Amino acid sequence: MKRLWVTGYRSYELGVFSDKDPKLTVIKYALSNYLKSLLEEGKIDWVISGANLGTEQWGLETAISLQNDYSVHTALMTPYLEFSKEWNDSNQMKYQNLTEQVDFTASTSDYPYMRPVQLKNYQNFMLEHTDRALLLYDPEHPGKTKYDYEAIKKYQEKSDYPLDIIDFYDLQEAAEEYEENHRKNFY
């Protein structure tokens, strides 16, 4: 198995509050291009992510959308039970729909949230059960993903663990490429 951990900014950190936001189109375009490249090179066959609103769910949605053309499995992992319990109905529905579409879902803890160690254990689980990572993240603009980024960097000191980053410059390039491709198709 060749497993990719996808994580990154939460939706609110990117100012994406709707599935119709044009930024989301560009983000999914960039994620899709990256995943296609790895799949075509035979570097991954699993996309594993968390359930956070934002990059994690978008990464899984993108991988699921590629399953008709590529042999890729998806897994949604959470750091504790009842992960979405405090979310509004709309976000809980998105989470529920995603759990029904992925190939595998589980929690790294057998309990609802109790203490921060559950988050650290989740992070360790993801590092030990994946072979590489993709972060939608820019170290110049830290957010909650900073903790995963730092954990991966530390893990790389003792393990061969490739880390790829889609940063804001990459997203700008993806936006320009997307616009150019759609302009060509329009005319």
UniProtKB/Swiss-Prot annotation:
InterPro entries for the chain: YspA
Top-level taxon in the UniProt lineage: Bacteria
Any one Pfam family match given in the protein's UniProt record, by short name: YpsA
Entry's family note: Belongs to the UPF0398 family.
PANTHER family: UPF0398 PROTEIN SPR0331, UPF0398 PROTEIN YPSA
Name of the protein this chain belongs to: UPF0398 protein LJ_1195
